[in-house]
Amino acid sequence: YKRQGTASGYSTFNSGVGFLLTYDSRDIPANAYKGIYLDFRGLMYQKFLGGDNNFYRLEVDYRQYKKVGNRKVIAWTAQTKNVFGDVPMNQYALSGTPFDLRGYYMGQYRDKSSHVVLAEYRQMFNTDKSTWVKRMLHHLGFVAWGGCGFMGPTMGKIEGVLPNAGVGLRIEVQPRMNVRLDFGRNFANDQSLFYFNMTEAF
């Protein structure tokens, strides 16, 4: 690389251009019950644009949601992130965020190609709200998910498999907006992490 790591850290400058194509039919993006989301983007980083390296990035993010009952949803996603060329280390594809493999530290695994597949069951309790206990339960719910990540130096060469599963609590603060409390398990390293957020993971 043009700039190497030093005692004070790693530094590089990237400048690029790209495109973004998005299709979104979700009813409510923050907590979808139905619909499809598809995001396809490509970026080109070049020295003639002022950056330090010549490399490319290609990402696809597909999500789908199906309502299977009253306040019950199955959601699934397939995502791929890929970089090609003279890629600086801080631009490698990575897995392990609050929005994909929950349970893995962000940046713990990175390579030139990262793929994630996840499926999640989401349910809010549905009561008649006739008592204060039932009214309280009506604002609670849970999720359970499972999936896997795959890492490698190219799209066709997988060198790391990252299984993932977890459960979560949902607290409805207003219609279709939940506080998200997730407990994710990292089976590759036998570690677990907790997450707090105001939107669903995907």
Task: Report residues per predicted region.
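Short glycine-rich, acidic/polar surface loops and turns
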Residues: 164-169
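Conserved small/polar residues in nucleotide/adenosyl-binding loops
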Residues: 1
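Envelope-exposed proteins and targeting segments
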Residues: 15-17, 36, 177, 194
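Outer-membrane beta-barrel "beta-signal"
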Residues: 18, 117, 171, 190-202
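C-terminal hydrophobic structural anchor segments
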Residues: 122-163
